[in-house]
Amino acid sequence: MEKIFQNVEIKPFLIDFSNPFIKNAAKRLFQLEEQLPLVPVNVVMDFKGINRAAVHGLSRVLQDEIPNYMLDIKPGGYKIEDSTDLFMTEQFIRNRINFIPIYAKNETLVFALRSLNNSCEVKTIYSRDLIQVAGPKLKYPIFNPTFEIGFLQPGKSLIIEDIYIKRGIGRKHAAFNLAVKTHFSHLDIEQYPTDKKEYMALSGYKQSSMTSDPRHHRLGLCFPAVPLPHINQAVRTYLKNACRVIIGRIQSIQKIYENFEEPQPELVLFSMDEEKTKAIITIKDETHTIGNLLKTYIYEMIPDISFVGYQCVPHKQEMVLTIIHKASQEDLITLLEKSIQNIIQTFQILEKNVDELIA
């Protein structure tokens, strides 16, 4: 398993200035005569030799389980007494500002929005109207000027101070999503031809991926805000960081059972009878992503296992992994360790392949 990452296609979405209509609209609305500083980038990747749980895990982490940034308003930042357009409520404006796609690395930046409509027409407020009021001078924009934030009626104003950069993950708030539109398919399961779609299952496969064992996959996604001069560098960083996040989360599980002979609240290990051992491992703040990875790799390591399953407990913010197998306690922990090492090795190789494929 030396090369998992087989192929990658990186396609930025660029404005077609050769089209007179688009060119005139860009110039009239935004005074644009060249490409925007940040562009959406579609990425399509082919993987071979790994199970679907690994591809699904990479997909989930890239989308909403990796730290990212969004713009937010600090408490009291929305100046109610100075904002006279009743339709532009704080929650509406906050939501629009949250979802401005940004490329940020510096959390000390602070922006403000001070807009007044002195005209007789409705005024559109764009992200270009945000002004930087604190933090180091930007060498390159962190968001495009074209995102619609709201509207102002004639004679009305909107004043917002303390718009800051907030760090988080997408599963807590969708505005933190690093990637969007993620989807993947299996390339080694026979599909119905196009002219027979009326007879096929909704998946399009002749065999269910639940009963097959696909090892050739295609993953597609979109990064909504990537600096135009550094597209490949940014995509490479995102993919490598996702691999490292998965490796780090898996390695944290190793600490739970490394001293399995000593009592600890996260691990319950006991013999059910003369042959079977049961392990119950509680992992804090973990998700289906890691649960599915563990379950799949343990099954591959121990095909004759009696039982392996997991359950996420949302109100406790934890995941519970249960394993039952005909083995001693020591042997069961050894098999679990080998399964975890296989996961780590998979994503270490994948991280290495990223450097080889994306210059």
From Swiss-Prot:
Q: Which GO terms describe its molecular function?
A: protein dimerization activity
- Stated family: In the N-terminal section; belongs to the archaeal RpoD/eukaryotic RPB3 RNA polymerase subunit family.
Q: Where in the cell is it found?
A: Host cytoplasm; Virion
Keywords of this entry: DNA-directed RNA polymerase, Early protein, Host cytoplasm, Transcription, Viral transcription, Virion
Which InterPro entries does the record match to this protein?
RBP11-like, RBP11-like_dimer, RNApol_insert_sf
Organism this protein belongs to: African swine fever virus (isolate Tick/South Africa/Pretoriuskop Pr4/1996)
Function text: Component of the DNA-directed RNA polymerase (RNAP) that catalyzes the transcription in the cytoplasm of viral DNA into RNA using the four ribonucleoside triphosphates as substrates.
On the tree of life, the source organism's domain of life is Viruses
Summarize induction of expression.
Expressed in the early phase of the viral replicative cycle.
What protein name does the entry list? DNA-directed RNA polymerase RPB3-11 homolog
> One Gene Ontology cellular component annotation?
virion component
Q: How does it assemble?
A: Part of the viral DNA-directed RNA polymerase that consists of 8 polII-like subunits (RPB1, RPB2, RPB3, RPB5, RPB6, RPB7, RPB9, RPB10), a capping enzyme and a termination factor.
The record's Gene Ontology biological-process terms are: DNA-templated transcription; viral transcription
The protein's predominant localisation is host cell
